[in-house]
Amino acid sequence: MPRSEEGQLTIEKTPSYFITKDVPRRVYQFSKHLKLIVVVRDPVTRAISDYTQVASKKMDSRSFEEMVFVDNTSRIVDTQWSPVRIGVYAKHLKHWLQYFPLEQMHFVSGERLIENPADEMLKVQQFLGLRPVINHRHFYLKSRKGFPCILKPNRQKGSHPHCLGETKGRIHPMIDPSVIRRLRDFYKPFNIKFYRMVNQDFGWV
């Protein structure tokens, strides 16, 4: 990590930290006073998005329906498949709570971050103890993909847009509705447990 100057907050972003079992202990050893920001989204949508990313690189030619179950007949969800395993947020959070209190964590709804980024960023700024400077004027909707873009101020040229890369917002494949229902049933108890752990309802159930 880069050094933080006085009066400066440094953010390090590595998505895999949240789901890697040994990381909470190592992070705690680095600093037990830091704050943690976790962006979560509907685990069913997240799994499909993860699959879409892999499929776009042609790393596996099998369909989502073939990958998500242990076999084609049992309808038992394959919890060892990474796109499924990552979405069991309660399991991952349990490891972090062994080292950090909930007060040092802030959970951002991935859905609300897209729908209303200014409100979500206000909560983040408040959590970090910052004077709010990012507001609705810093965002606009990129209609083609439905993702908000950021207007970054430039002293010489004025505000200029910064949008997410082309890898974001890929069109998801059509998934058998019965598979979606099976996944929602699978995640439901884990989602409810996660809601209780963080005292927040994300609306996935």
Model-predicted segments: where are they?
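Anion-recognition interface
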Residues: 1-205
